[in-house]
């Protein structure tokens, strides 16, 4: 089926890997193999080929969108006769736990910051906006960590709203996966970035998810371009379990780790524990809150085995 025929049936243009890779045009590879190795996640295969065929075309597309947005801002300033404040272009990245959102975010940050314009690209994860464990315990939400109700949504929305309003210095809390909690007094200051990449589970949620409470303002209201990283559920489960097993041999062995006790599990016990955590928390959050937002994304990256993107869908 041609792209033209698809356009009549869906709000997305659909590309297989080869079609998408052809859209790279002449964008140069600006990352070395060593840099790519540092960018990838704990359980992901990220190659020069993946960056060249998937992420370079995506960075080219985003550069077009961002340049268009800058021209629009310039037109508005000319009309108003003002010198406007620098307003960041916000890119959100959503998707399930273990799908590779963080790797996608880091690769895009590296590529976009290397465009000739030398843009300042900041990366913020919404993990920092989780309520502290003390609050979650008081509210009985420790087993709902990552669900929408576990976040300080007021602070998260204010953060992106302030950035879009031109506030020069905005602070974001920082999360530690070692202590499984927000770092007290560990805020990061974000100073007028050209581009902000916001990575998190629920960044595509909108008022449609709360039909009985329509007065909410959401992060998605401030996002210029949204990406959903997708994969079949069986792969997500496998990746989650494999990641858990690697943490068991790595991060969990640190005595300061919140999950230090998991390091003592046998492999069979660890697999069983990971399966339970997946089914009772992460799969539930995926089905109830994350997956229903996929159709709102500007672009959907669908992965197959080894975290390789096999299909790209771009909203018209």
From Swiss-Prot:
EC class (word): transferase
Name the GO cellular-component terms. Answer: cytoplasm
Q: In the Enzyme Commission scheme, what number(s) does this protein have?
A: 2.7.1.33
Q: In which pathway does it act?
A: Cofactor biosynthesis; coenzyme A biosynthesis; CoA from (R)-pantothenate: step 1/5
Annotated GO biological processes are: coenzyme A biosynthetic process
Query: What molecular function terms (GO) are annotated for this protein?
Result: ATP binding; pantothenate kinase activity
Localization (cell): Cytoplasm
Can you tell me which residues bind ATP?
95-102
Keywords, comma-separated and alphabetical = ATP-binding, Coenzyme A biosynthesis, Cytoplasm, Kinase, Nucleotide-binding, Transferase
Catalyzed reactions: (R)-pantothenate + ATP = (R)-4'-phosphopantothenate + ADP + H(+)
- Its family? Belongs to the prokaryotic pantothenate kinase family.
Q: What is this protein called?
A: Pantothenate kinase
